[in-house]
Regions:
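Electropositive phosphate-/nucleotide-binding environments in soluble metabolic enzymes
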Residues: 30-34, 38, 116, 120, ...
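An anion/pyrophosphate-binding glycine-rich loop and adjacent beta-alpha core
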Residues: 125, 131-243, 299, 303-306
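FAD/FMN-dependent oxidoreductases across multiple families
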Residues: 229-268, 315
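Alpha-helix capping and helix-loop boundary segments enriched in small/acidic/polar residues
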Residues: 28-31, 78, 82, 105-117, ...
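Glycine- and aromatic-enriched mobile tails/lids
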Residues: 6-24, 58, 63-65, 161-177, ...
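Conserved redox-cofactor binding core of oxidoreductases
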Residues: 3-81, 86-104, 137-139, 144-161
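Glycine-rich loop(s) and the adjacent beta-strand/alpha-helix scaffold that form part
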Residues: 92-149, 286-299
Length: 460
């Protein structure tokens, strides 16, 4: 990337900063990502890659045991059009997933999200063709400024403090661009906990930072895509050197929860690969995306050279998805996709919530699973769409429902409390499960859960 023109050494050397304990190794490389997308697209085009913008994929095709292609929808004009695609291999790279749980900042505004509001495309596509999913039962929550959701908390260089000025954690007492304040990484629910206990709010304090340090922080935020936040603060006269910035815990998202893949990015379905935050067994973030995108891309290309095209457009899965989405367009006065999405968020937030303040149980999860089935039944028969845009959103809601189904079933199968998965009927952490992954997947119409050793290769 550095050779291509992504500035990986903006200070002249490789610099790792943030998300680290004082005095311990820093693993996160800080670089200038402002031109990253432009550079990577340029390099991809240079080797012959073709881009089809405004063509979301809404279904995968499987012929025999292999992936054979996909169904895209051309949404470049007001009237959508189906575009079947034959493919020898497929690599999913749709990013993380928002809009599955009620928005913690602004419940009525679903798109106030800490990242790009991606919506479960990769996980939903993989789920429906039988790919195994892993770590779906563990809620991932991020944090950042209150009400205006923006992630990138490690780019803030200050100290988390109580209202009386006392540091919340023991790791930082002054602003530090090298380490930041790692308290919220260690104590994931800190911002929610201090509010629940009445000892909050929690503030990010940069009052002791130098002008040079603040200039660095603002530059780093620009490289991380936080320009809307910076613009808002400047417009409203919010100066972190003078004003404490309240932080909060955001709603659960699927970030490093999803498809179970091999070291080369291949899922349990031959010919189907995945890279990035929709992968469930490799961590998350840019490092995983870069590694699996590179390795998975090479592996997918090598495998494609050994197989023939198959008639993906003739498969039942493609036919059924075309019929379902067409029925939405035939029902322009039908229920709005937002109604279905918000109902899904309510079900997930009430029956499969994130701990530690809220709990799960067999009775809650079974009820949630039943309500989810009822919601899907109603949505498929009542949802309508008036144009390409609303059809795309309706398809996203169906993908989100698939993720909800995977989460409910995985949470039922993990009969213990671990991390933010808190079972009131199994309040302990089972040490015998510490070296195992729980995977779930569709086999026919049934959801099947299985345990596998963490270091065991992905099985088909």
């Amino acid at each position: 990337w550095d050779a291509w023109g992504v500035n990986m050494r903006p200070t002249g050397d490789w610099e790792c900063k943030g998300h680290a304990l004082p005095g311990k190794p820093r693993a996160f490389l800080k670089y200038d990502g402002s031109d990253q997308k432009k550079v990577l697209v340029r390099e991809a085009k240079a080797v012959g890659v073709k881009f089809y913008n405004h063509h979301p994929v809404v279904e995968l095709a499987r012929v025999g045991d292999r992936i054979a292609g996909a169904l895209a929808v051309d949404i470049s004009t007001e009237q959508p059009a189906f575009v079947p695609v034959r493919a020898k291999t497929v690599l999913l790279a749709t990013g993380l997933t928002h809009r599955l749980y009620m928005n913690a900042s602004t419940p009525g505004f679903m798109f106030n999200t800490g990242h790009c509001p991606n919506c479960a495309g990769g996980q939903g596509l993989g789920w429906r063709v039988g790919a195994r999913m892993v770590n779906m039962e563990f809620p991932y929550t991020h944090a950042g400024p209150k009400y205006l959701q923006r992630c990138g908390k490690a780019t803030w260089i200050g100290v988390y403090r109580y209202p009386d000025g006392k540091p919340i954690g023991p790791f930082a007492t002054k602003s530090d661009p090298q380490y930041g304040d790692v308290t919220s990484d260690i104590w994931n629910s800190v911002f929610e906990d201090v509010m629940r206990k009445g000892t909050g709010p929690a503030y990010m304090d940069c009052s002791d930072a130098t002008d040079e340090q603040m200039a660095y922080m603002r530059w780093a935020m620009t490289g991380e895509g936080l320009t809307a936040l910076l613009t808002y603060m400047e417009k409203e006269g919010i100066d972190p050197q003078k004003h404490g910035v309240e932080f909060m815990r955001y709603e659960p998202i699927l970030h490093g929860r999803g498809l179970d893949v091999s070291d080369e990015g291949e899922t349990s379905v031959p010919g189907l690969f995945a890279a990035g935050d929709l992968v469930g067994n490799g961590g998350c973030g840019i490092a995983l995306a870069a590694y699996l995108g590179w390795e998975g891309g090479m592996a997918a290309a090598a495998q494609a050279a050994t197989v023939d095209f198959q008639p993906a457009e003739e498969t039942e899965s493609i036919r059924k998805r075309m019929e379902l989405l067409s029925s939405f367009m035939d029902r322009p006065e039908g229920a709005d996709w937002k109604d279905a999405n918000m109902a899904l968020q309510q079900i997930m937030s009430d029956y499969a919530p994130a701990g530690p303040a809220k709990v799960r149980s067999e009775t809650l999860l079974n009820a949630g699973r039943d309500y989810l089935k009822q919601l899907r039944h109603s949505a498929e028969r009542q949802m309508g769409a008036t144009c390409s845009h609303t059809l795309m959103r309706a398809a996203e809601v169906l993908d989100l429902m698939d993720c909800g189904e995977a989460i409910m079933n995985a949470a039922l199968a993990r009969q213990e409390t671990r991390a933010n998965h808190v079972r009131s009927d199994f309040p302990f952490t089972n040490p015998l499960l510490a070296d195992k992954f729980l995977t779930v997947g569709l086999e026919g119409d049934e959801v099947v859960a299985r345990w596998r050793p963490i270091r065991q290769p992905v099985s088909r």
